[in-house]
Amino acid sequence: MANETQKVGAIHFPFPFTPYSIQEDFMAELYRVLEAGKIGIFESPTGTGKSLSLICGALSWLRDFEQKKREEEARLLETGTGPLHDEKDESLCLSSSCEGAAGTPRPAGEPAWVTQFVQKKEERDLVDRLKAEQARRKQREERLQQLQHRVQLKYAAKRLRQEEEERENLLRLSREMLETGPEAERLEQLESGEEELVLAEYESDEEKKVASRVDEDEDDLEEEHITKIYYCSRTHSQLAQFVHEVKKSPFGKDVRLVSLGSRQNLCVNEDVKSLGSVQLINDRCVDMQRSRHEKKKGAEEEKPKRRRQEKQAACPFYNHEQMGLLRDEALAEVKDMEQLLALGKEARACPYYGSRLAIPAAQLVVLPYQMLLHAATRQAAGIRLQDQVVIIDEAHNLIDTITGMHSVEVSGSQLCQAHSQLLQYVERYGKRLKAKNLMYLKQILYLLEKFVAVLGGNIKQNPNTQSLSQTGTELKTINDFLFQSQIDNINLFKVQRYCEKSMISRKLFGFTERYGAVFSSREQPKLAGFQQFLQSLQPRTTEALAAPADESQASTLRPASPLMHIQGFLAALTTANQDGRVILSRQGSLSQSTLKFLLLNPAVHFAQVVKECRAVVIAGGTMQPVSDFRQQLLACAGVEAERVVEFSCGHVIPPDNILPLVICSGISNQPLEFTFQKRELPQMMDEVGRILCNLCGVVPGGVVCFFPSYEYLRQVHAHWEKGGLLGRLAARKKIFQEPKSAHQVEQVLLAYSRCIQACGQERGQVTGALLLSVVGGKMSEGINFSDNLGRCVVMVGMPFPNIRSAELQEKMAYLDQTLSPRPGTPREGSGGEPVHEGRQPVHRQGHQAPEGFCQRSAPGPAICPAPCPGQAAGLDPSPCGGQSYLWPRHCCCAEVSPGEVGLFLMGNHTTAWRRALPLSCPLETVFVVGVVCGDPVTKVKPRRRVWSPECCQDPGTGVSSRRRKWGNPE
């Protein structure tokens, strides 16, 4: 259908077809939020075209914003002077170009001529800035139109070259000093390629101030960042689907879009990509950039040059001229990550760095959560949020994502292994290291020793054979942990900065990679014990290569130094005392014991985003309870309540086309209670299997069944296999199980889809497929099981967290202490058992955390075509003391038995499913949902005209159904 322009109020929204009314409301509210610079929480259910509404609404605002900015600039440039603030366009003043130029209050009693002079000067300065900005924009647009191949940012290469020259001078000086001493023989041994493993001289504190000023001067040479929109989502597949939606939108041909990703996703160097581990890929990439300058530096020294090239070659794809070409190509036409990767291979340019070069001139930047929410990653990628717009999609798990991203866990074996490696490194190169390097290395060794001691172990013994006298879990504040570990006198900020600047973890990995198997035979006997200990912790390469090539085991193929991981724990210990806790988990042996930093206040990492950005939009299909975002994330980040705007809309599916059904008891009248105490009972697992057998017998196509956890799915699967229920299920549906490995998900889904298609054509005894999945896993979001792929979705129990978990209890206590209690009524959209203080019930915020976590983890339903009447099969009506309402308010539901579900599916519409409960069902009655779509081929007759799956368009209304094929995120 041709693109249409919808006018909502005075705003024109280009749209590829006639939008729903809720989409018009969505775009209008989004426009107002961006214009006013507020924080918006948008809730739009699955299947309502949320992505397209975000695209058209946000890009319409950006179009109008740039137009107003050009008009204002033209007016000021034409008159030469003018009011610096316009009432209508006050928000327009406009970008950083108008910062501080106007509205500066003058001291009272100042002469009028002084005030007039200052005002005129400010106006002239503003006009000069506008002229410069206009010239820069014109130059940028010309470059994009003509695709000129210019090499920019040469200062980066110059800077790296200077660093390498300094390092070479230091190494040459060290060799001259030692070549006549007792270490001369050993020095000759080091010249066979070990120079790259030696730490360069480290400067800190005042010594770094001069270098920082140089860095600031170089930063001025970077290209200016225009006003843009940063769109982020959880997975790369969701980002790819969003880019495809942008291509199909009316803005697809004009918008300048760039997709960002990790080195693991964008690397085109097969030698580097084959390393597998993300950390190893990152480190090798940086090392290869540095080695390209060593190659040039050693041109006149033939032998050293050959030795360095044999060890590590420069990356042929890191070429500024080719990356500039890739940048221009990426901005000239919308490309997803796969197209960017193909372009990089064709142009022999690095897509990772080429896409980063495109950020300043891009209007829409698409990136994963981690690159936006992690400050260090954001800074390294060159992302600047000042006065920009950020849209966070699929944000229902935003709080948990930030918490998990900044929580770090290290094991006793990792601590011992890092200590052993670092001690051998110091023994090997200690004579060549400067005093400041040795000081910091000894501090790191001391920290590792104390971390092991606080767990109750001995750093000098093998952690696999050490048994701890005390076991259990202990939780401490950060300060208490530092005092107990006796490391409160060490400046962790300096240690963290040293680890980052000196790249000690990278040097240490290179050292262990080189000498992991042969070092002990070449050293003195006193080091043989350390090397033997290291080998006992780290398997040989041949043994690792024989392991299965699973993603979960990818890191074991080429293990990175554990110091890389421990650096994250050291950085976490610099968090404010009240914002985190340290959990000491002492198990049977030291190797299994762990130290974990638990972030309690995710707002400290989100505060910088909301403070710098012009506007932030948090969107998702199910954002309830919204109060969690308001209180735990925004209020704690310093956002005023008046700045937060909420928007929520219903579904486009008519209520008579979707009907959730809750199964409270099984075939043998066994009550379904999937609590931690009862869900592992054999009769409970048997009852679930019998219910699924009956459902699979009458439901055509695909059935998707979600379990609360991988462990419970494993237990149920093993029990069914032992009791024969798995064979009964396999006779009706081919069974697929969600893999734990991410790279196997596509293979499983493809086989699942092909099986259903084949069964639909053959019409044999096997009528489809059954997919066993896990809530919060790789199938729970971002994938649409449309048409026959999702005829029935069943939820077994609810993914409540373990209430006895020390982490959860500490989070609950933190919320109780931090968030002010609200007497009387509970928060909207969440529950929690009231705690009575005197005669007044008080709903504790912490007691509501388990239900909020459960609600955010539950998967969204599979949305079926509007004319197909849908039903839901849910298991487990387990009672709960709270009064939460977890059910979507636009759905209706009924409590039925498995027999009634079967009768309905076979065409009997007079069963108890018509006893619909209120639209908001209390938690005691409704726990679980799954959608069963009636097959148009069977006796279930649709109440409206059937839509064509090919065009996905209602012939009666001409409105798109917003459904996408399997494999694409919503």
Swiss-Prot record:
The entry's keywords: 4Fe-4S, Activator, ATP-binding, Chromosome, Cytoplasm, Cytoskeleton, Developmental protein, Disease variant, DNA damage, DNA repair, DNA replication, DNA-binding, Helicase, Host-virus interaction, Hydrolase, Iron, Iron-sulfur, Isomerase, Metal-binding, Nucleotide-binding, Nucleus, Phosphoprotein, RNA-binding, Transcription, Transcription regulation
EC identifiers of the protein: 5.6.2.3
EC supergroup of this enzyme: isomerase
GO cellular component terms listed in the entry, alphabetical order: centrosome; chromatin; cytoplasm; extracellular exosome; midbody; nucleolus; nucleoplasm; spindle pole
Species whose genome carries this gene: Homo sapiens (Human)
UniProt superkingdom: Eukaryota
Residue positions, PTM Phosphoserine: S262
Tissue note: Expressed in melanoma cells. Not detected in epidermal melanocytes of normal skin (at protein level). Highly expressed in spleen, B-cells, thymus, testis, ovary, small intestine and pancreas. Very low expression seen in brain. Expressed in dividing cells and/or cells undergoing high levels of recombination. No expression detected in cells signaled to terminally differentiate. Expressed weakly in keratinocytes.
Protein name per UniProt: ATP-dependent DNA helicase DDX11
